[in-house]
Amino acid sequence: MTFVLQDSCIRQKWPYPTLKIKGGPRCKTLRNVERIWAFLMRHEATRHDMLLCVGGGSISDLGGFAASTFKRGIRFGIVPTTLLSMADASIGGKTGIDWQGFKNSVGTFHKPTKTIIDTRYLQTLPEREFLSGMAEVIKTGLLSSYEDFYATLRALEDGHISEELILRIRAIKSDIVRRDPREKNIRQWLNLGHTIGHALEEAGLQWGRPIPHGYAVMQGLVAELYLSVMKLNMDRQPLRLLTHLMIEHYGKVGYSCKDYDRLIAFMRQDKKNTNHTIRFVLLKGVGEPVLNCTAEEAEIREALDFLFTL
């Protein structure tokens, strides 16, 4: 039997028992996981049943984690309704919730049984959600090639992304995940922009100024491309292009040098770190990611200076 977990903002009816939870960055809580477990238990769900998650990336992260832990794991499917979830969050089997203020600090690998892509959901997507998704799309383009990177920038400028480009971005990420399903090596490439991005996102949540995941990732990409220029001598042109588009479409960053200590403290909690050292994915060039890059605190502060003074 199928059970549905759906973002309460979506007005779609299913012929299955449905639990509605408001999506967004605040929904990935242990309390909501318990609500899903109770819903499944109340309807006598078995290990042979499936939980279908309808919504953005936060709903699939939340529902996937609940499914992976209910009765030691039941199947789950995803109907992504945002660009972010279509192009990124619905791929790869990562699930998780935020705990004690830290992003995705509790989670599992649990691959969805099915994913249903329907781009008609994007026709009513608010601009803010489109921009949030485009940050992950651009990140994947940066990891791939100049051709893909420029295609993603054109989509951002046009305010529209084609189904062909969505499928291309999904294929790039899916290939990386296929080659490294447990994130032991090259799958960590997908964390480009996320060391600083997650710190900004966590800070926003804890300080009562939440920002969309993709906005934080876009800011993280700009700062980490700056580090790439500084540390790996990457050509500055991708940084110039991305900086211009971030200012034009995403606005300025609402932090200052007074926040550096706390932001760096968040970075120290990043799951990529080893030996208490903050680690980054940086670029030698477009399509040339480098794992396990380190930076001195002074260098991180310089990158934040660049970002915050734009």
Regions found by a protein language model. Name each.
Residues 37-54, 63-78:
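Non-catalytic interfacial helical region
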Residues 42-45, 111-114, 120-127, 135-147, ...:
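Generic secondary-structure signature for well-ordered alpha-helical cores
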Residues 64-157:
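A glycine/threonine-rich phosphate-anchoring loop and its flanking beta-alpha core
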Residues 151-261:
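Active-site segments that bind and position negatively charged phosphate/pyrophosphate groups
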Residues 1-50:
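ATP/NTP phosphate-donor binding region
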Residues 135-138, 234-310:
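C-terminal charged capping/lid subdomain of soluble metabolic enzymes
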Residues 49-68, 188-200:
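Glycine/serine-rich anion-binding loops at beta->alpha junctions
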